[in-house]
């Protein structure tokens, strides 16, 4: 008969993953609500206790304990066992450590522990209370993985470990984050709930007001703590404990003595130092980790003029000096993961301890009754000692003597066994008194145990007494300070920025940088670092307190505070926008750059190839939340082939639009409505089907130039294009040819005075002695031509101008720009 079964892969995967999920939920990642332990932690404690590796004895090699645990109870690899053992020994992760370790057991800096062959470990004293009375049949046991011996499914837990040490873990579909608490406060809450089973959460929080982290710190948000205790979920703010320390010379330093729970100290120090290195906050001189055996200490030395409180607020907001701790109190309750609140945790623990105390009392009572039975037999023997001795002497052997005792004097099997094994020295008068005292003590003990078993009030008194004993022995002061309200950190970012002079440069391909005046002045403009196929389109002197706006050909705008730009040498290429802006496209280019002091006022005009135009307000470009990683739209393009042709600040002048086919239209800028960033604008010029916009510019002079793709150039009077309304076709400025027709490559105003500087992106740079406006043309063969536009004579409107060289017509224009 075949053992092969036909099953669908879908059914098999679902069923097997269901098994796996159930296993890791119940047997790996989540703690039991009763003892607060995960299976691996429970197995470590039980195995070490079973092997006698306890508090009152010497340390043993960790590797030996790990081997015993792995071989007997936890066959999942030595590293997982050792990691769990190490964590239970780390006093910065546990409020009460359960394992004491000799040797390197890691650090708050995230250093790994020494290998287990080098370290030694034993159970801590308080861990013994978790295992107390386990030998008295108080908890259920189950077979281990190979059915060779049994292990406990839960520990007796003489204190509420789940709340005291907390827990964290990730399972299939579940995760848990339960913070540690102060032992004394937890026990006080348990004792109160024993006396008041229906106690309100508000009353319980008078005894247990909130978590108590082993690393101290300040916990803010009483309402969130209450919410977490009520629902099992919540979030509190955990802030480092800091103080401002005065130094010589009027300087100050910020001292950190406590940091938030589970924050890596070395990483924190590195992040704070990165703030100094990147000059995100001016005024930090040095960051030092001065921690030693006496405790944690981080020193942040400040400059003399620095605002210590502002710097501290910045560090609290942007580093792990302050973090959010998220409560997610999930535990295994009756084999099921549940999100539990404080009342449920306490009631489950009380119920568990009730079972433990009753089972322990039953065990002790049975043992006492058995001993009382023996003692009663021995006392009776002493009253008829001579007869008993004679009977034993006349017996053939031990078995015969036992049988004779049972038949002749009605002793039980247990009493007969005790009599025949009785040592002769026990037959003295002193021993008779001892036996009588023992009988009285046993009867009192049995009465007490019976009361515990039969009377709930007596049992609860025992529970409270034992909890108070634990509290008395292990009580320690609260480490974390609780504050009712979460303080909102407000930072005047502008006040943090040191005002420095710098030079900002931008290339068409999207490379940008800022350069110190020293580096800039040590080089010439032509020595700027850039790729061979790229073009420098913007250089300007600016202050680090100002802002840079970059407008692209795809209708996107990118914002950068000047102080956030990478400070590089003038000869360095710079940082490409694609390194930080996730939606910067490969074919995207920078069209226009602008440095602004504020966003309060100012208008821009944008014109697209499809002939649409719009004005928009600078206020709408105020920094958005994701500016560091994403650009935002300033104009909506009509299709994928559409591009922005012109972007410039708005002035109260006419606008002149020139199409590739040679149509020019002039109208007032006031005809263009101010619209939102996501609009496409209105029709600026009426285009034929095969036409598109080549250039658009503000009319600020009496003439303008037109350059064609064949290298023909002309200058004509602005008055030849009379002002009309937008959305018209315009007038031709080229003469149409049947063969090799001219098409507009670039058009722009011809400036004859310094008023042109606001449109010249290079005007803030020291120039040559002449202020003439030059047109630079590069042909497709790499030839460069320069023409002084002001020297051109005016041409008629319908003419094609003159070629700038005899060969340019065959080469055609690749790049053209004015300067």
Curated annotation (Swiss-Prot):
InterPro entries: GyrA/parC_rep, Gyrase/topoIV_suA_C, Topo_IIA-like_dom_sf, Topo_IIA_A/C_ab, Topo_IIA_A_a_sf, Topo_IIA_dom_A, TopoIV_A_Gpos, Type_II_DNA_Topoisomerases. One of its GO terms (molecular function) is ATP binding. PROSITE patterns: TOPO_IIA. It is a peripheral membrane protein. It is found in: Cell membrane. The keyword Aminoacyl-tRNA synthetase does not apply. The record marks 117 as: Transition state stabilizer. The record marks 38, 74, 76, 87, 93 as: Interaction with DNA. GO terms for biological process: chromosome segregation; DNA topological change. The keyword Cytoplasm does not apply. GO terms for cellular component: chromosome; cytoplasm; DNA topoisomerase type II (double strand cut, ATP-hydrolyzing) complex; extrinsic component of plasma membrane. It comes from the Bacteria. Belongs to the type II topoisomerase GyrA/ParC subunit family. ParC type 2 subfamily. This is DNA topoisomerase 4 subunit A. It comes from Streptococcus pyogenes serotype M1.
């Amino acid at each position: 008969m075949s053992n092969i079964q036909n099953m669908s892969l879908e059914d098999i995967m679902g069923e097997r993953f269901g098994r796996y999920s159930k296993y890791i939920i119940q047997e790996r990642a989540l703690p039991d609500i009763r003892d607060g332990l995960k299976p691996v932690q429970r197995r470590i404690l039980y195995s070490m206790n079973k092997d006698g590796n306890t508090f009152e004895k010497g340390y043993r090699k960790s590797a030996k304990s790990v081997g015993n645990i792995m071989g007997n109870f936890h066959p999942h690899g030595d590293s997982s066992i050792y990691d769990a053992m190490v964590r239970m020994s780390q006093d910065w992760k546990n409020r009460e450590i359960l394992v004491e370790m000799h040797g390197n057991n890691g650090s708050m800096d995230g250093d790994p522990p020494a290998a287990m062959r080098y370290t030694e470990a034993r159970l801590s004293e308080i861990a013994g209370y978790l295992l107390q009375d386990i030998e008295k049949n108080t908890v259920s046991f189950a077979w281990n993985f190979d059915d060779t011996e049994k292990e406990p499914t839960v520990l007796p837990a003489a204190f509420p470990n789940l709340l005291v040490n907390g827990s964290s873990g990730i399972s299939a579909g579940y995760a848990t984050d339960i913070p540690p608490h102060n032992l004394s406060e937890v026990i006080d809450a348990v004792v109160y709930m024993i006396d008041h089973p229906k106690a309100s959460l508000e009353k319980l929080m008078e005894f247990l007001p909130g978590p108590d982290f082993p690393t101290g710190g300040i916990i803010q948000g009483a309402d969130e703590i209450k919410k977490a205790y009520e629902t099992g979920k919540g979030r509190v703010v955990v802030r480092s404990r800091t103080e401002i320390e005065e130094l010589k010379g009027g300087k100050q330093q910020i001292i950190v003595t406590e940091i938030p729970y589970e924050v890596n100290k070395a990483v924190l120090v590195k992040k704070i130092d990165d703030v100094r290195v990147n000059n995100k906050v001016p005024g930090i001189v040095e960051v030092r980790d001065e921690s030693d055996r006496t405790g944690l200490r981080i020193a942040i030395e400040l400059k003399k003029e620095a605002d210590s409180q502002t710097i501290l607020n910045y560090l609290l907001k942007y580093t792990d000096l302050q973090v959010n701790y998220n409560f997610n109190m999930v535990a295994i309750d009756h084999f099921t993961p549940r999100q539990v609140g404080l009342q449920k945790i306490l009631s489950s623990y009380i119920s568990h301890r009730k079972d433990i105390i009753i089972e322990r009392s039953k065990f002790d009572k049975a043992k006492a009754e058995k001993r009382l039975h023996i003692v009663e037999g021995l006392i009776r023997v002493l009253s008829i000692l001579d007869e008993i001795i004679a009977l034993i002497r006349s017996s053939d052997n031990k078995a015969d003597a036992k049988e004779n005792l049972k038949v002749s004097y009605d002793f039980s099997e247990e009493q007969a066994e005790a009599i025949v094994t009785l040592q002769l020295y026990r037959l003295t008068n002193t021993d008779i008194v001892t036996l009588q005292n023992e009988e009285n003590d046993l009867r009192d003990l049995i009465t007490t145990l019976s009361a515990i078993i039969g009377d709930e009030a007596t049992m609860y008194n025992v529970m409270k007494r034992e909890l108070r004993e634990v509290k008395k022995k292990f009580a320690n002061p609260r480490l974390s300070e609780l504050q009712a309200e979460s303080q909102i950190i407000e930072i005047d970012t502008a006040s943090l920025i040191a005002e420095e002079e710098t030079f900002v440069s931008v290339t068409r391909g999207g490379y940008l940088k800022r350069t110190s005046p020293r580096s800039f002045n040590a080089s010439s403009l032509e020595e700027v670092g850039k790729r061979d196929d790229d073009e420098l389109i913007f250089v300007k002197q600016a202050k680090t307190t100002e802002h840079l706006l970059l407008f692209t050909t795809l209708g996107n705008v990118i914002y950068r505070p000047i102080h956030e730009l990478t400070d590089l040498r003038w000869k360095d290429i710079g940082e490409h926008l694609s390194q930080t802006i996730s939606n910067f496209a490969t074919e995207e280019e920078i069209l226009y750059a602008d440095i602004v002091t504020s966003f309060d006022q100012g208008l821009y005009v944008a014109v697209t190839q499809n002939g649409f135009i719009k004005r928009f307000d600078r206020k709408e470009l105020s920094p958005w939340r994701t500016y560091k990683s994403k650009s935002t739209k300033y104009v909506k393009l009509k299709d994928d082939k559409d591009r922005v042709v012109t972007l410039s600040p708005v002035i109260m002048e006419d606008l002149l639009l020139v199409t590739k086919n040679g149509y020019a239209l002039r109208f007032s800028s006031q005809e263009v409505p101010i619209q939102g960033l996501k609009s496409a604008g209105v029709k600026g010029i009426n285009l034929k089907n095969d036409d598109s916009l080549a250039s658009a510019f503000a009319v600020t002079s009496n003439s303008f130039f037109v350059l064609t793709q064949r290298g023909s150039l002309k200058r004509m009077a602005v008055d030849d294009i009379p002002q009309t309304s937008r959305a018209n076709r315009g007038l031709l400025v080229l003469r149409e040819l049947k063969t090799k027709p001219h098409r507009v490559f670039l058009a722009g105003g011809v400036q004859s005075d310094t008023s042109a500087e606001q449109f010249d992106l290079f005007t803030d740079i020291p120039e040559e002695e002449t202020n003439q406006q030059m047109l630079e043309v590069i042909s497709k063969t790499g030839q460069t031509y320069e023409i002084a536009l002001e020297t051109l004579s005016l041409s008629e409107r319908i003419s094609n101008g003159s070629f700038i060289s005899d060969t340019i017509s065959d080469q055609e224009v690749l790049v053209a720009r004015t300067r």
